[in-house]
UniProtKB/Swiss-Prot annotation:
It is found in: Cytoplasm, Cytosol. Involved in glucosinolate biosynthesis. Hydrolyzes the gamma-glutamyl peptide bond of several glutathione (GSH) conjugates to produce Cys-Gly conjugates related to glucosinolates. The gamma-Glu-Cys-Gly-GSH conjugates are the sulfur-donating molecule in glucosinolate biosynthesis. Its EC number is 3.4.19.16. The gene is GGP2. The lineage of its organism: Eukaryota, Viridiplantae, Streptophyta, Embryophyta, Tracheophyta. This is Gamma-glutamyl peptidase 2. GO terms for cellular component: cytosol. Residues 17-212 form the Glutamine amidotransferase type-1 domain.
Length: 248
């Protein structure tokens, strides 16, 4: 019997920066490097450009990842409305969806939560997330850990999580850093896929266009010098979720 190839898809909600294209060949390769395993097939849908899988093809995939974006998840842009529609279908199908930053907020919106501008302002740099211990089940895809260090880069946030959500992590900047719904939706406000080089380049870009106050960017650079993200643990956690693995 021929072993069936496990298929996953990235919904890319941001254009590739020149830096990422030059260094990695595009964000798609960054995500596959972080969350992919040998023998899998990963497909790219540039949802920001209106590229979506056909309804009849959704069943072919084991899981989906929604990337970050400079766009607001709470707007009525055509492609965002279409993305929400596709995610609703996947939710009904109980397909695994890993939402990251903008993707985290899209899943919140789809599930009836509230998204908007971050109450405490933009968060850029290395941040520490406190894990809510009593929602972690022993042997689940989520390790028994007290905290996670993650790269942050956002100005919006989940203001009210969906009623059905379990809030797994919070920080001093954001009340809903990580949430899950049942066993098929997992969302991070931060960026498990980013490394320091990608973040530093983003800081330079937003500084040039004055997208964020300079004081915030200086603090971000300082945090990058002082701390390290829990990259390996974050990648393994996301893989465990997408592939139905357990920690023990």
């Amino acid at each position: 019997m021929v072993k069936q190839i496990r298929r996953y898809a990235l919904f890319q909600a941001t254009p590739d920066s020149e830096f990422v294209k030059e260094m990695y060949g595009g964000y798609f390769n960054v995500f596959v490097s972080a969350f992919g395993d040998e023998g899998e097939q990963w497909d790219l849908f540039r949802v920001i450009d209106g590229e979506f899988p056909r309804d009849e093809d959704l069943e072919k995939y084991e899981g989906f990842v929604i990337s970050g974006s400079l766009h607001d998840a709470f707007t009525e842009e055509d492609w965002i409305i279409e993305l929400c529609s596709v995610c609703k279908k996947l939710d009904v199908m109980k397909k695994k969806i890993l939402g990251i930053c903008f993707g985290h907020q899209i899943i919140c919106r789809v599930r009836g939560g509230k998204v908007g501008r971050a109450r405490k302002g933009p968060d850029i740099g290395l941040g520490n997330i406190t894990i809510v211990q009593d929602v972690i089940k022993p042997g689940d895809y989520f390790d028994q850990i007290e905290s996670l260090s993650i790269i942050q880069c956002h100005r919006d946030e989940v203001l009210e999580p969906p009623e059905s959500a379990r809030v797994i992590g919070f920080s001093d900047k954001c009340d809903v850093e990580i949430f899950s719904v049942e066993d098929h939706l997992l969302c991070f406000q931060g960026h498990p896929e980013y490394n320091k080089e990608i973040l530093l380049e983003i800081i330079d870009r937003v500084h040039k266009i004055k997208f964020v106050e300079e004081e915030i960017l200086e603090k971000a650079k300082d945090s990058i010098k002082k701390f390290e993200p829990d990259t390996q643990r974050l990648h393994m956690l996301c893989k465990n979720f997408l592939k139905g693995r357990r920690t023990h």
